Every structure is written in structure tokens, then in C-alpha cells.
Curated annotation (Swiss-Prot):
Gene symbol of the encoding locus: tsaD
Disulfide partners: none
Protein name in the entry: tRNA N6-adenosine threonylcarbamoyltransferase
Matching PROSITE patterns: GLYCOPROTEASE (PS01016)
Family recorded in the similarity comment: Belongs to the KAE1 / TsaD family.
Cofactor requirement: Fe(2+)
Gene3D superfamilies: 3.30.420.40
Function: Required for the formation of a threonylcarbamoyl group on adenosine at position 37 (t(6)A37) in tRNAs that read codons beginning with adenine. Is involved in the transfer of the threonylcarbamoyl moiety of threonylcarbamoyl-AMP (TC-AMP) to the N6 group of A37, together with TsaE and TsaB. TsaD likely plays a direct catalytic role in this reaction.
Matching CDD domains: ASKHA_NBD_TsaD_bac
Catalytic reaction(s) noted: L-threonylcarbamoyladenylate + adenosine(37) in tRNA = N(6)-L-threonylcarbamoyladenosine(37) in tRNA + AMP + H(+)
């Protein structure tokens, strides 16, 4: 095995076309991201057909840019990696097809990567991981507590029963008049308001590690609709602060509960919602008091959203285990997180 392992990694599971070159699983040589946010904003969310069309238009350009920025050619590569699930089937297919084509044409191994494993392994760009560890993976499509005894070994110990946290942010943002994606603006407004509405903290009293955000989402929407019927104008800042407090309280509470049951050395907060300032502040402050020996790792802002570099980091683990894909690899939109490859 070469001392310098270079992996060309593809990510196209939703609305970002990203290709990266990652060295030895922890060094980013390039990480090109073509976002589609403006194309989806007028629809209030991601439209699968639009996403697929943009991936087709961007995938070759982004690949060329990633190789150029990294200063490498196909001959320098060790392997090609790609997200094959979970995600939007059409979007995934674009990345899978591109990766398979390049791997076949240049006689390179193909490494299949679970999208959510990628989010967790983005922490490898911050510092080496120490097992066992716990990950709180929070995004638009997932809210999961994952226990990892070792590299590549995933056990979901908590999951959402309905909406993911990121999905709730976008839907509440819409009712507050915030364009998609709403997370960053809801977070900003929340820091300007107060928790005056005291929305429900779902499942925080139940004896499990699962989440539920649909009731909270409905509570916010119903509060706003009721006020409009009465001709009242509610504070967007207070609504955002009250909603975010309810989300963050539950995420922190369940994470602490998991840490009591699963002693670990590190906690990774991963996924798009990991960019939320309110969540980071609450998690760091609470764990510093109650779990001072647990090292909290949050990937930098540029690596919390979907990106190719995180797929390269995950692929390095899979490559070490020789978990490779054949040319029959297909997109798996409902891929289970318990199977990283």
C-alpha cells in the first residue's frame, strides 16, 4: 500500500455537487462544491428533478477543478470513492455513474461510502479519532445518535421517530418567511430573541434515546396561524428563539443521556445542523460541566454541509478494510446507516 494514498471522492446525494481529493484520509488537497441553493429557493426546498439536472451539468466541471486544485492527475490516484446512499436516487446516480466511469477508465478501485458516515468522519480533519466515540449526526434528513466501538463500526442508539431536526428548521423557517435553507437565519434570529413561548420538548422524559420534532414543528406553525387569525403579529426573534431552545434542549439532553449509558472519549457533532451556533454553544457549555473528560469535536463550518472531502475521509477507513465495490454498484437512497459500505 502506497505511503501517500490519494482518493478522488464524489458527493451528490442532495443539492451539492462536490468532488474532493483527500490524502491519507485527513488532509484535504481540494474540495470543490457547486451549490444549487438559489435554484431550489423559489420552491421552498429541494426539487429532485432540478437537483439531478444540476448534478449532470456540474459533475465534470467540478471533477476537473478538484484535480487541478490538488495538482494531481488520474495516474496519481489510489482509488475513487462515492456516496451511494442515503439520499435522492437521481442525484446519487449522477455521482455513482461518474465515479464508476472514472474508476473503470483508469483501472482504479471503487470505494462505496455511506453519506452519513461521511458526515461523522469529517471530524478526522480536526483531529485523530479516539474510540469508542459517540456521534450526534444532525442534518436535514437525519437525527441520530451513533455509537462507534471502532473505526467503521456503527450502532444507532437513538433515531428520530418523524422529522429530522434540519427538516423542522426549514419548515419552521418557511412559516417565519425565511427562504430555504432556513437554518442559518433561524439561528441568527434566535440569538436576538427570548424563549417566551416554551414550546414542547418532545420525548425528553421518555426512557430512550430517540427524537421527535414533528410535534414541535406543528406547535410553532399553529401558534403563528392562531396569532394571524386574531390579527396579532408575533416576534419572529422570540419564535425562533423558542423553537431553537426546544430543539437544542432535546439534542443536548439526549446526548447527555447517551453519554451516561455509553462512556466514550469523544463526542462528534456532525451534519448540517452542526453549524448551528446555538447548538454548539449549548453542547460545549453543558458537557464542559457534566462531562469534562469528553472531547467535543465539531467539524469546521465548510465541512458540516455536504462535501466531497468528508466522503474521502470515510473512504480512507473503508479502503483500509478493503471494502470495495464492483462495477454493479448502484444508488441506494434508503441505505441503512448501520451499513457504512
Amino acid at each position: 500500500m502506497a505511503a501517500r494514498e490519494l482518493i478522488l471522492a464524489f458527493e451528490s446525494s442532495c443539492d451539492e455537487t462536490s468532488v474532493a481529493v483527500v490524502e491519507n484520509g485527513d488532509t484535504i488537497l481540494s474540495n470543490i462544491i457547486a451549490t444549487q441553493i438559489k435554484s431550489h429557493q423559489r420552491f421552498g426546498g429541494v426539487v429532485p428533478e432540478v437537483a439531478s439536472r444540476h448534478h449532470v451539468e456540474q459533475i465534470t466541471l467540478v471533477t476537473d477543478a478538484a484535480l487541478k486544485e490538488a495538482g494531481v492527475t488520474y495516474d496519481d490516484l489510489t482509488a475513487v470513492a462515492v456516496t451511494y446512499g442515503p439520499g435522492l436516487v437521481g442525484a446519487l446516480l449522477i455521482g455513482v455513474t461518474a465515479a464508476k466511469t472514472i474508476a473503470y477508465a483508469h483501472h482504479l478501485p471503487l470505494i462505496p461510502v455511506n453519506h452519513m458516515a461521511g458526515h461523522i468522519y469529517a471530524a478526522r480533519f480536526v483531529k485523530p479519532l479516539a474510540y469508542p466515540l459517540l456521534a450526534l449526526a444532525v442534518s436535514g434528513g437525519h437525527t441520530e445518535l451513533v455509537y462507534m466501538r471502532s473505526a467503521g463500526e456503527f450502532e444507532i442508539i437513538g433515531d428520530t421517530r418523524d422529522d429530522a431536526a434540519g427538516e423542522a428548521y426549514d419548515k419552521v423557517g418557511r412559516i417565519l418567511g425565511i427562504p430555504y435553507p432556513a437554518g442559518k437565519e433561524v439561528d441568527r434570529l434566535a440569538h436576538l430573541g427570548q424563549d417566551t413561548f416554551h414550546f414542547p420538548r418532545a420525548m425528553d422524559k421518555e426512557d430512550n434515546l430517540d427524537f421527535s420534532f414533528s410535534g414541535l414543528k406543528s406547535a410553532v406553525i399553529n401558534t403563528v396561524h392562531h396569532a394571524h387569525q386574531l390579527g396579532q403579529e408575533l416576534s419572529r426573534e422570540d419564535l425562533a428563539a423558542s423553537f431553537q431552545a426546544a430543539v437544542v434542549d432535546v439534542l443536548v439532553h439526549k446526548t447527555q443521556k447517551a453519554l451516561h449509558q455509553y462512556p466514550v472519549k469523544q463526542l462528534i457533532v456532525a451534519g448540517g445542523v452542526a453549524a448551528n451556533q446555538g447548538l454548539k454553544e449549548a453542547m460545549n457549555e453543558t458537557l464542559a460541566v457534566n462531562f469534562p473528560d469528553v472531547d467535543v469535536i465539531v467539524p469546521p463550518l465548510r465541512l458540516t454541509g455536504d462535501n466531497g472531502a468528508m466522503i474521502g475521509a470515510a473512504a480512507h477507513i473503508e479502503w483500509a478494510k478493503q471494502h470495495l465495490a464492483s462495477e454493479s454498484l448502484n444508488a441506494d437512497p434508503g441505505l441503512s446507516f448501520t451499513h457504512a459500505s
